[in-house]
Amino acid sequence: MAFKESTDVFGGITVRSRDLSPDQKQLDAFSSLITQSLEDWKKRRVRGVWMRVDIQDSHIIPALVERGFMFHHTQPHCLVMTKWLPETPCTLPIYAHTLIGAGGIVVDSQDRVLMMRENRGHYLGWKFPGGASDPGENIFETATREVFEETGVKTVAKAVLCFRQLQRSQFENVGDIYFLCVMEALNVELKPCPSETAECRWLTREEINSFPDTMIRDFHLEMLSRYDKWKSSGRPGCHSVSCNLSGKNCMMFYVD
């Protein structure tokens, strides 16, 4: 009995371990069937094979490795393996290799800046609140959530002030892009997160400028200078517009 498979527009197929019958999940039966299937797929000129293995079916992974399947990516309950069948160079897309994060530069009506210090990490000085995106979030949603989680301040994102790109993050072969957003505060009461935040405060520019180099980075001072230029320009800057592309909702960012 052949595998249940789905095809894609690029000449590839996907097999999911959850679709295997109990008999097909037996290691000997699976090993025999995957060998036969690879021969059949080559005759059919299938290009790439995607095998999605649920964690409860992980006993079949060695059989796939023995037949040339490579690890593509993993999630908490699933491992995806691939095999390229033609003799030509593999053109299967690689998995996501860049992390996204966002933070907020929040200035209140008294021109005080919302800053915080973390409980742990390589840098324990003052910084703008922010962190990594959760799945499904856009940039502004991440910045809004992170500012609130770390400081208790609710905000509305107005524009992207800047972003920085790192070719290497804490994970091997994974980059990092971090967006700093201009945020409008909806409240000023502080409720720091006890697990993440050592301290958060509304700081005056005089207080910020008085900190030693160990407690404030040149980056933060430069961003405050950039914020001042953005505010004095009266322009919207890099702002977002919701739109629909090919049936998918997305955010477009325009610099005006």
Where in the sequence are the language-model features?
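Conserved GNAT acetyl-CoA-binding A-motif
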Residues: K42-V53
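Acidic, metal-coordinating catalytic segment for phosphate/diphosphate chemistry
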Residues: I60-G103
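The catalytic Nudix box helix
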Residues: K127-V160, C181-V182, E189
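N-terminal strand-loop-strand
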Residues: L85-F128, T155, A159-C162
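Short hydrophobic/aromatic beta-strand or adjacent loop that forms the aromatic wall/cage
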Residues: F10-G12, P76-V80, G101-G103, D176-L180, ...
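Conserved beta-strand-loop-alpha-helix junction that forms the acyl-donor binding cleft
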Residues: M51-H59, N119, S133
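Nudix hydrolase/Nudix homology domain
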Residues: A2-F30, R44, G121-W126, P135, ...
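Active-site-adjacent beta-strand/loop module that shapes the phosphate/pyrophosphate-binding cleft
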Residues: D108, L166-L190, R205, E222-K231
